[in-house]
Amino acid sequence: GALVFPGGRADLMDDGAELAPQLVRSLASGGPATLQVTAIRETFEECAILLAREAGQTGMVSATRAQELGHYRYLLQGGDTSLAQFLARENLLLACDELIHYANWVTPDFMPRRFDTHFFLAVAPPEQQAIEDGHESISVDWIRPAKALELIDSGHFTALLPTICNLHRMSLCRNAAQVISDSLDRSVIPVTPRLHKEASGLFLRIPTNVGYTFCEQKIEKSSA
């Protein structure tokens, strides 16, 4: 199976202009506003973690409350309710201020479909349980970055270069607090892998000056 972070494509319902200002907590300082909303919505849909607050409250919604709201995951996925309707009906504010813009990867130009992907960090609300949706995610788990890399190296999981590189960067830190501190000291630089052909095979590589220590992935062995 493929190991991925929760996420997906921005939807019209994620547009800040479509959401009443009172529905969104103060936006994070980094990353496009619409994509911050997308990150929270997709994480809720795919793994039930909800970065939101009850209106007038400072803490995140409780694990019990998040579980009670779980049926909205499928309503949002199916287009049976909008994000604005969900938030207004349940008196919630998105906690965009908890997001930290971590990375920006752009699909190589030789690919038929290209994406401009932004990664965000956030500390999971206490006691909230990650639960797969059975559609976009079939299994969810908390794994330390170093352990995830071991599972990828062993062939237990497959992963794309952006996932591997981000895991490598995080594995250099002792804990979540250090990952966040480290990211706040960095500028987010758009990264586009390039294809390199060598005698040993084809490689995807990124520049060595964009903040990653792991910079390549073999995608095809040599036929020689």
Model-derived features: positions:
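Terminal peptide-recognition signature
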Residues: 43, 120, 167
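Charged mid-protein connector segments
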Residues: 58-102, 107
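NUDIX/MutT-family hydrolases
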Residues: 85-90, 96-105, 114-124, 131-157
